[in-house]
Amino acid sequence: MIKAFHDAGIAVNMDVVYNHTRGTTTGSLYDSTVPGYFYRLNADGSYINGSGCGNEIATNHEMVKKYVIDSLKHWMKDYHINGFRFDLMGCLESDTMEEIYDELYKIDPKVMVYGEPWTGGTSGVVEGATGAVAGSDGNGVGAFDDDLRDALKGTDGFGGLYHGQLA
């Protein structure tokens, strides 16, 4: 399917959700492998829930960051994905997003890396160092906004540009 899109001149971007994983209780696959490493934790040992889904991965830990980057490289090299849209990019550090872009750029200088510049709750990422910052400082990582999306596609009661409502 990806080849068919490429043959038609269409790039393929993959929607990725690295901000959290399934399993919000003790005993998740990652916690079973390396307890207390894969997720951001509160002082009492409970999961930080910046994703709004029960947990938030700790991309500030080197091997977690490597896991994310290696998996993205796999999708680009083995499946010829052209870019990635990150769910809740605000739950990932800006330096993580910049490193992701830098590594993927080495594979394809036309790579698209962008995401939602917000979180789903109070994140464990240090204020001012979120992936949202990476999407605003001209380093190749993009961010988008619901207001722009809504202006283009419209919302309930408002048609948007694609439906002839904006001049």
Regions found by a protein language model. Give the residues of each.
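Aromatic- and acidic-residue-enriched carbohydrate-binding clefts of CAZyme catalytic domains
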Residues: 1-8, 22-66, 70-78
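Conserved, mostly hydrophobic/aromatic
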Residues: 5, 15, 75, 86, ...
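Short, well-ordered coil/turn segments that N-cap beta-strands
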Residues: 8-10, 15, 80-82, 108-111
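Conserved structured core elements
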Residues: 11, 62-69, 82, 90-98
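Conserved beta-strand edge residues that scaffold enzyme active sites
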Residues: 18-20, 90
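Short N-terminal helix/helix-N-cap motif within the alpha/beta-hydrolase-1
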Residues: 21-22, 94
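Glycine- and acidic
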Residues: 57, 81-86
